[in-house]
Swiss-Prot record:
Subunit-structure text: Influenza RNA polymerase is composed of three subunits: PB1, PB2 and PA. Interacts (via N-terminus) with PA (via C-terminus). Interacts (via C-terminus) with PB2 (via N-terminus); this interaction is essential for transcription initiation. Interacts (via C-terminus) with human PKP2 (via N-terminus); the interaction competitively inhibits the interaction between the RNA polymerase subunits PB1 and PB2.
Region spans: Disordered: 53-82
Region (Promoter-binding site): 249-256
Family to which the UniProt record says this protein belongs: Belongs to the influenza viruses polymerase PB1 family.
Catalytic activity from the UniProt record: RNA(n) + a ribonucleoside 5'-triphosphate = RNA(n+1) + diphosphate
The protein's name in its UniProt record: RNA-directed RNA polymerase catalytic subunit
Source organism of this protein record: Influenza A virus (strain A/New Zealand:South Canterbury/35/2000 H1N1)
């Protein structure tokens, strides 16, 4: 029978059906080709919003820079970046007045973090612009390369392992007249193979040194590499995002630590919390406004949208904020926090790969690298690209564009939230000094504004005042995209509120299914996702049971592990049937070995191995979990693992799942083709780091591992630890005198070698 889909919604309030309108099923759109065009759009737009500012030239790099601060205020609704310094400082002062001691306390907390943070903090994060190779690399490799170059140039403060000392090296490197960099490259040559007598291509990896003068080095240190943001749903056009290099990252981290500490103390801030905690925080603000709007007042909520938040923010404003927030703090602390905004006001945007041309008639393809855009003849380009290039040309230096105004996406989320909250804070009656007042929520560029007033005219006046206050701080509320409703129904960061938050289940859809890590992890992640959605997202028992059955089916098709008694033929069915026939207790077989599924919605929290352990044949247990079995993963597996889930919007989330090491928790080997490329040297470096870290962990098992706060190298830490352990073992009689003497001797030898080095 055909079901009329509208029947599904008869009993559902419209807000709960919001899920069905979200573009979250199916594959998200990905970008192909180069991001050069999108980056040029960003650079040109940013300059357009600040065009009535003052032009200056950077004395070191010669880059032209536009400064819109304290510029003319816009006449009408056009977005603009002309923030007024005195207004920003006043907003900060009022924020401090209504939260006594907030800045002071956050500074004290941050100072502690600054002194204790290790440089390995910078290894977190995905792709990072590696200035030594002028392209993107994994964060850990980019950091390693930076430190290697610093050391070969005699910058050695970083050896203490503290982030703040690494940053001292960064500062000093900018004063150097030249920096010598080692790059990996590969040579190809044709040689005759002795055995087969055929000609083969031999690749050798070379390292070559070259010197960067001060100007080139500064340009690289201030460069943000750009890429296209992938997998953005619900948008027709792609957009560019930026990844900064290692010189900037450490400074940004400290600024964001301070801002995060402030946000934690602000009830209107949607950061840094997430999930249910965020919902509770937001519900509080709404409750406050509803209870305070007595019978005499009416209350309205704006679901807000800001026009081009990042492109109208300005690093110079952030510098003013930091100067105010840290006003009574020690000089060194103020300096270290002011460097990030200063670097950002001198930033350069790398234009990416350039343009690809192809001639249909001659079947030729050629790449025009970004470096050539400054002086190539424009007749080859279509009109829109021509306009872009003409506009950006005055800003180009060595394939990067000078981009002083604006912030790139996601760099100062916390600090910009503080700026937004400072405007919400001005809505208290003691500041508005009239009958209307406002409050709201802010999370990076997203906001919800709740206005209370005795009548409609008051609401309108309140909204207008909020709008104009925002303009003074370089924030542009979009009149087209923001909408107003009676308080009780609004949307904020994709949470829909209707007398309480309704579950937006569609956002979780992409996380369902088989993740593709390995058989063991996938089973665990799959059931954990279902469990989490029952807890957090109104996934009902019947739907959860169905989701579970679909997941098991999906899992069996993915790993070709249908039940041993099935008729389905796959490549694995021969082996699985054999195992099925020789197993006494068939219920004990894992699903991935052709066993039955014992999961139901009551036992989703138990790892499959534990669920079936008592039901397993003894020899099966032995094969499955025997540490001597070469197929059991030998990584000391933590009892809790992290999977990276890609929710429908927002950053990738870490999701914890239970992990039991079995023959099914294999880790796939690296693709061999990397070994023949110029990346090989980098790979060897990575393996060396891996070995060092593993060795270090042997000395400091996680149970006793305290971050060393003192200043010592890894080697020193391990040697001193070895001595302590040896002494304890010797005194308790666990080791003999000869062994003890030998350990001490080895420790001394290591120290001697280290000194000679």
């Amino acid at each position: 029978m055909d079901v009329n889909p509208t029947l599904l919604f008869l009993k559902v309030p419209a807000q709960n059906a919001i899920s069905t309108t979200f573009p979250y099923t199916g594959d998200p759109p990905y970008s192909h080709g180069t991001g050069t065009g999108y980056t040029m759009d960003t650079v040109n737009r940013t300059h357009q919003y600040s065009e009535r500012g003052r032009w200056t030239k950077n004395t070191e790099t010669g880059a032209p820079q536009l400064n819109p601060i304290d510029g003319p205020l816009p006449k009408d609704n056009e977005p603009s970046g002309y923030a007024q310094t005195d207004c920003v400082l006043e907003a900060m002062a009022f924020l401090e007045e209504s939260h006594p001691g907030i800045f002071e306390n956050s500074c004290i907390e941050t100072m502690e973090v600054v002194q204790q943070t290790r440089v390995d903090k910078l290894t977190q994060g995905r792709q990072t612009y590696d200035w030594t190779l002028n392209r993107n690399q994994p964060a850990a490799t980019a950091l390693a390369n930076t430190i290697e170059v610093f050391r070969s140039n005699g910058l050695i403060a970083n050896e203490s392992g503290r982030l703040i000392d690494f940053l001292k090296d960064v500062m000093e490197s900018m004063d150097r007249d030249e920096i010598e960099v080692t790059t990996h490259f590969q040579r190809k040559r044709r040689v005759r193979d002795n055995v087969t007598k055929k000609m083969v291509t031999q690749r050798t990896i070379g390292k070559k040194k070259h010197k960067l003068d001060k100007r080139s080095y500064l340009i690289r240190a201030l460069t943000l590499n750009t890429m296209t943001k992938d997998a953005e749903r619900g948008k027709l056009k792609r957009r560019a995002i930026a990844t900064p290099g290692m010189q900037i990252r450490g400074f940004v981290y400290f600024v964001e630590t301070l801002a995060r500490s402030i946000c934690e103390k602000l009830e209107q801030s949607g950061l840094p919390v997430g999930g249910n905690e965020k919902k509770a925080k937001l519900a509080n603000v709404v409750r406050k406004m509803m209870t305070n709007s007595q019978d005499t007042e009416i209350s309205f909520t704006i679901t807000g949208d800001n026009t081009k938040w990042n492109e109208n923010q300005n690093p110079r404003m952030f510098l003013a904020m930091i100067t105010y927030i840290t006003k009574n703090q020690p000089e060194w602390f103020r300096n270290i926090l002011s460097i990030a905004p200063i670097m950002f006001s001198n930033k350069m945007a790398r234009l990416g790969k350039g343009y690809m041309f192809e001639s249909k008639s001659m079947k030729l393809r050629t790449q025009i690298p970004a470096e050539m855009l400054a002086n190539i003849d424009l007749k080859y380009f279509n009109d829109s690209t021509k306009k872009k290039i003409e506009k950006i040309r005055p800003l180009l230096i060595d394939g990067t564009a000078s981009l002083s105004p604006g912030m790139m996406m996601g760099m100062f989320n916390m600090l910009s939230t503080v700026l937004g909250v400072s405007i919400l804070n001005l809505g208290q009656k003691r500041y508005t000094k009239t009958t209307y007042w406002w409050d709201g929520l802010q999370s990076s560029d997203d906001f919800a504004l709740i206005v209370n007033a005795p009548n409609y005219a008051g609401i309108q006046a309140g909204v207008d005042r909020f709008y104009r206050t925002c303009k003074l701080l370089g924030i542009n509320m979009s009149k087209k995209k923001s909408y107003i409703n009676k308080t009780g129904t609004f949307e904020f960061t994709s949470f829909f509120y209707r007398y309480g938050f309704v579950a937006n289940f569609s956002m979780e859809l992409p996380s369902f299914g088989v993740s593709g890590v390995n058989e063991s992890a996938d089973m665990s992640i799959g059931v954990t996702v279902i469990k989490n959605n029952m807890i957090n997202n109104d996934l009902g028992p019947a739907t959860a049971q169905m989701a579970l059955q679909l997941f098991i089916k999906d899992y069996r098709y993915t790993y070709r592990c249908h039940r041993g008694d099935t008729q389905i033929q796959t490549r694995r069915s021969f082996e699985i049937k054999k195992l099925w026939d020789q197993t006494r207790s068939k219920a004990g077989l894992l699903v991935s070995d052709g066993g039955p599924n014992l999961y139901n919605i009551r036992n989703l929290h138990i790892p499959e191995v534990c669920l079936k352990w008592e039901l397993m044949d003894e020899d099966y247990q032995g094969r499955l979990c025997n540490p001597l079995n070469p197929f059991v993963s030998h990584k000391e597996i933590e009892s809790v693992n992290n999977a990276v889930m890609m929710p429908a919007h927002g950053p990738a989330k870490n999701m914890e799942y239970d992990a039991v090491a079995t023959t099914h928790s294999w880790v796939p080997k690296r693709n061999r083709s990397i070994l023949n490329t110029s990346q090989r040297g980098i790979l060897e470096d990575e393996q060396m780091y891996q070995r060092c870290c593993n060795l270090f962990e042997k000395f400091f098992p996680s149970s006793s591992y305290r971050r060393p706060v003192g200043i010592s190298s890894m080697v020193e830490a391990m040697v001193s630890r070895a001595r302590i352990d040896a002494r304890i073992d010797f005194e308790s009689g666990r080791t003999k005198k000869e062994e003890f003497a030998e350990i001490m001797k080895t420790c001394s030898t290591i120290e001697d070698l280290r000194r000679q080095k």
